[in-house]
Amino acid sequence: MRKILSILLPAALLLTACSGSTESGSDNLDDITVKAGAEGAAPTVDFSAPLELPDSSAEVITEGKGDGATDGQWIRYRLLAKDAVSGEQLGETYSGPVDQTVELSEGFKTADPALYDALLGSNPGSEIAYYVQPPEATSASAPAQNPQLLFLTVQDVRDKPVKADAAEVAELDKAGKLPEITLDKEGVPSVKIPEGKDAPDNLIVKVIEEGDGKQATESSTVKANYAGWNWSEGTEFDSSFSRGEATEFPLDGVIEGWTKGLTGLKEGTKVMLSIPTEMAYVQGQGDAVGDLIFYVELTDVK
């Protein structure tokens, strides 16, 4: 259960309270009440604590609209976590800049069939209550952990992203829906994100300058100068330019967006990558959260 909880919860919300309660509470997810929050704010989720169920279980509280999610699709969601015993709120992601994502995969189905079944068929606007039993203690000295109630709101349902073809990239570029990369006189990049435009659903590879060296394969080791920004706020989270040297890495050992985005490019190529969350850091890595933008100069291919 800890495995699936780590899939759903950002690290900041992987909290476990250990307080107890002797009051009479609820034993039914139907007793949960929800009051919508303001735009960009979490809803108010109430229940009679302690909430006590025999097993982990999930239930759709509110039906959304649109096509229901099918196996293999990705769900983008926001969530709120509460201690099921005390009712204390542990954290929420509604007020954050980006959605969380999870794939309706066989691994997910095996790890938690109850939640998988609740998310299968869900659509944007669906609200799901998920009661999570704590993991078994790993030692006799480990403190007892309380169950949690997670409340999820489905934001979007998406097919697994793919690498966009040249026609799609050209169309998005012509419509002004792609980020613009500018280099200063020292060759250091900055980005301008199109105002009011959402990140593309698919992986975008926009070649700025084509090289004429060796072509990269999925198993190549490459050296590159690069910078990365979050689509949501345009915040730079990493840059080899600030470190003053290119970085070497194997293409089969990086995020999927880099592997698929750089494979086939030639040494010397300069490129902009727009990478959807599902092909980047699904649960975030430091400040690299959500959909990402990279500028990459491929300086060496081995």
Per-region residue spans from a language model:
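Cross-family detector of peptidyl-prolyl cis-trans isomerase
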Residues: 2-302
